[in-house]
């Protein structure tokens, strides 16, 4: 107060005012502070001071020919004085106004293309909706977020090559554009930016924004996708938040979201197959997300999520060194431990073999809706500070930490037997057994934990076993905080190994991830996910299995056909027919298979009975282990649409309908593709059609006139002879039989005779 009075007193004297406004600053330290180095020390003051001058801007000398000396109001636009230390002229801000209004017009066609990210942002904001502002305490935690909506996912190096190729195509320097995305983008941008007059440097900057993911470590409460982050300053403050719905989606957010869904589906499916790792790799390599190969996305996309990281580990990519337990990401911040096996008894006297962490360690735990700091010693929780969105989220974090602590009172709180299994019906490991048990019901765990009196610490309160907050008492070692715990900020990636059962370990052998950690949450992907692998056909239910199986046969018909005739057993064992078996009633699978295999064998033996449509229709039924029986079927049942539907052995049905004229196959009304019938069917002139009712006499005999086509044969009278053109352009002499004999003997002798006649 005294100082202020003194200052006021000084300011009232005219001499003080004069000293402050008129005298020069000659103190060396001050001069040094403001003149050393190139860095501007007070940019906003400098700007204000410059703009108060008459000619604060410098411009190229050519400006004097392009801009008049005075504008319509008679104000001077540029000074005849040169800028000190350069050959530029001094210009008034009014010259900029004149230029904007009267300067030369250039084509604006490239602006929306170059400044695409800005134009799109304006559109999103225009169509976005801002809701009410709420005042409340914001629990923000720092997370690594994507700050640049609408980008591709190229690495900095890949983007640099693309930019050089697009903007400076004639510059020297080795540029290798390898990835598909690089080539597509380069081609697209070169076309878009033909004759572009915007400065190359600007184009390069803008391209970088479009191609590379930029991340920052920012305090966030709420949505973390890039379309929310771009308005972070509008949606959350220290004590307020504003509701906001983005006015558009961007591909990078959609890719992230769809990648997580695809990875979860693939890990869940692989976990139940005979060889999880091989299956997972097969699925990753054959899946596309929004038209891009999933493996390409995995190589470029930095999303950290359990399933995504398992897929990356399988591909030999580096991942974050943090580990996952109970849906929380744990990062050790200090301490160390060694691991040793111990056998512990549960409250139900069941023995659990557990890897105990021996030593003092501190961790941060970050989940979707709660975060915590955990300090633990050997089998003892020392302290847990939790913060979360709501009571439920806080409870989830507490359960995970209590199980992770491996404390005796937690193990003794188990009631009943632990026999949880994973999707493949294998028992879970002991730690996950405990976790599942208490996630189902944590009442006994919380009651047995013990409570303690607490000191009053700013920003922290206690929590009782029934999850009510308290300022006097709390569960032992556990406090709830208003402040969130920041996510682990480092982007460091480590080399990991993965075993056959998809357990991911770091180089010290610690398990970082396993399929048990993959969330069961189902979502709808924003981009189309195309799983080409037959293992994923089941994901959309029985109908999709039916359609996909037949589509696969049609797409691969050329190879299937050869295998069908030469190596049927190998064909029947193809994994693509596995999903189909779940549609066939279990009791009759074997009989169907035996029946179809016998039918096929007859087709192979009896030339001329080959029937493409029928083979395609019945092939999936032959994949089950066959039972020998004398049963014949006129229709086969498949379980789709909640009931049995019939597929007719001969003829069409809703489940399998082939239109001979359009050559289209429809399965349950869905198009399954075009069938290219074999030339050896119908009337196209190969052995099979020759055989029925004709006797082959030998090589061509000119006396019987020119060779007829197979269609013309039908006009022959019984006993009449003719030359006929068969399949491979060979001509043989045939005679129409005098009586209709068995097709079978005809066919067999015919093949032998054709061979003899041709040779």
Curated annotation (Swiss-Prot):
<keyword id="KW-1157">Cap snatching</keyword>
<dbReference type="Pfam" id="PF00604">
    <property type="entry name" value="Flu_PB2_5th"/>
</dbReference>
<dbReference type="GO" id="GO:0039523">
    <property type="term" value="P:symbiont-mediated suppression of host mRNA transcription via inhibition of RNA polymerase II activity"/>
</dbReference>
<keyword id="KW-1190">Host gene expression shutoff by virus</keyword>
<dbReference type="InterPro" id="IPR049113">
    <property type="entry name" value="PB2_helical"/>
</dbReference>
<feature type="short sequence motif" description="Nuclear localization signal">
    <location>
        <begin position="736"/>
        <end position="739"/>
    </location>
</feature>
<dbReference type="InterPro" id="IPR049114">
    <property type="entry name" value="Flu_PB2_6th"/>
</dbReference>
<keyword id="KW-0899">Viral immunoevasion</keyword>
<dbReference type="GO" id="GO:0044423">
    <property type="term" value="C:virion component"/>
</dbReference>
<keyword id="KW-1195">Viral transcription</keyword>
<keyword id="KW-0946">Virion</keyword>
<dbReference type="GO" id="GO:0006351">
    <property type="term" value="P:DNA-templated transcription"/>
</dbReference>
<dbReference type="InterPro" id="IPR049115">
    <property type="entry name" value="Flu_PB2_C"/>
</dbReference>
<keyword id="KW-0507">mRNA processing</keyword>
<dbReference type="InterPro" id="IPR049106">
    <property type="entry name" value="Flu_PB2_N"/>
</dbReference>
<dbReference type="InterPro" id="IPR049111">
    <property type="entry name" value="Flu_PB2_middle"/>
</dbReference>
<dbReference type="Pfam" id="PF20949">
    <property type="entry name" value="Flu_PB2_3rd"/>
</dbReference>
<dbReference type="GO" id="GO:0039694">
    <property type="term" value="P:viral RNA genome replication"/>
</dbReference>
<feature type="site" description="Mammalian adaptation">
    <location>
        <position position="627"/>
    </location>
</feature>
<dbReference type="InterPro" id="IPR037258">
    <property type="entry name" value="PDB2_C"/>
</dbReference>
<keyword id="KW-1090">Inhibition of host innate immune response by virus</keyword>
<comment type="similarity">
    <text>Belongs to the influenza viruses PB2 family.</text>
</comment>
<dbReference type="GO" id="GO:0075526">
    <property type="term" value="P:cap snatching"/>
</dbReference>
<dbReference type="GO" id="GO:0033650">
    <property type="term" value="C:host cell mitochondrion"/>
</dbReference>
<comment type="subunit">
    <text>Influenza RNA polymerase is composed of three subunits: PB1, PB2 and PA. Interacts (via N-terminus) with PB1 (via C-terminus). Interacts with nucleoprotein NP (via N-terminus). Interacts (via N-terminus) with host MAVS (via N-terminus); this interaction inhibits host innate immune response.</text>
</comment>
<dbReference type="GO" id="GO:0039545">
    <property type="term" value="P:symbiont-mediated suppression of host cytoplasmic pattern recognition receptor signaling pathway via inhibition of MAVS activity"/>
</dbReference>
<dbReference type="Pfam" id="PF20952">
    <property type="entry name" value="Flu_PB2_7th"/>
</dbReference>
<comment type="function">
    <text>Plays an essential role in transcription initiation and cap-stealing mechanism, in which cellular capped pre-mRNAs are used to generate primers for viral transcription. Recognizes and binds the 7-methylguanosine-containing cap of the target pre-RNA which is subsequently cleaved after 10-13 nucleotides by the viral protein PA. Plays a role in the initiation of the viral genome replication and modulates the activity of the ribonucleoprotein (RNP) complex.</text>
</comment>
<dbReference type="InterPro" id="IPR048298">
    <property type="entry name" value="Flu_PB2_CAP-bd"/>
</dbReference>
<keyword id="KW-1191">Eukaryotic host transcription shutoff by virus</keyword>
<keyword id="KW-0945">Host-virus interaction</keyword>
<keyword id="KW-1048">Host nucleus</keyword>
<dbReference type="Pfam" id="PF20950">
    <property type="entry name" value="Flu_PB2_4th"/>
</dbReference>
<protein>
    <recommendedName>
        <fullName>Polymerase basic protein 2</fullName>
    </recommendedName>
</protein>
<keyword id="KW-1113">Inhibition of host RLR pathway by virus</keyword>
<keyword id="KW-1045">Host mitochondrion</keyword>
<dbReference type="GO" id="GO:0039657">
    <property type="term" value="P:symbiont-mediated suppression of host gene expression"/>
</dbReference>
<keyword id="KW-1104">Inhibition of host RNA polymerase II by virus</keyword>
<dbReference type="GO" id="GO:0006370">
    <property type="term" value="P:7-methylguanosine mRNA capping"/>
</dbReference>
<dbReference type="GO" id="GO:0003968">
    <property type="term" value="F:RNA-directed RNA polymerase activity"/>
</dbReference>
<keyword id="KW-1097">Inhibition of host MAVS by virus</keyword>
<dbReference type="Pfam" id="PF20951">
    <property type="entry name" value="Flu_PB2_6th"/>
</dbReference>
